[in-house]
């Protein structure tokens, strides 16, 4: 097999982020496809965002149905523990404070294309490879069905 002994190809475990996942042997691996499925409103996007934030690994996050402002508000809430309404107010009234907190997520690279194709995703990955000299360790496609 080509992948044996080649960690640069992928397969190594991503950093653990939730004890419940560890306890149940749920492991996300670099460059592998994992699907988070559930009913609308079940928290799939929130879980994906929390994974990206906590893993602290270079991440491409493609959000097809949520805008940049909403994602910044959710992320700020995760980082600070504020409610989303408090976070929205701080982002609007004190953007410098928000930017400082959001810097904890500088390892996440965003795409808000509402209808990305495979070529678009490949272009995003290539851009990150050129920027970092390596592929993103985690790729999140939020809302695969749209």
Regions found by a protein language model. Give the residues of each.
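Conserved inter-motif catalytic segment of the P-loop NTP-binding fold
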Residues: 59-146
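The Walker A/P-loop phosphate-binding site
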Residues: 1-82
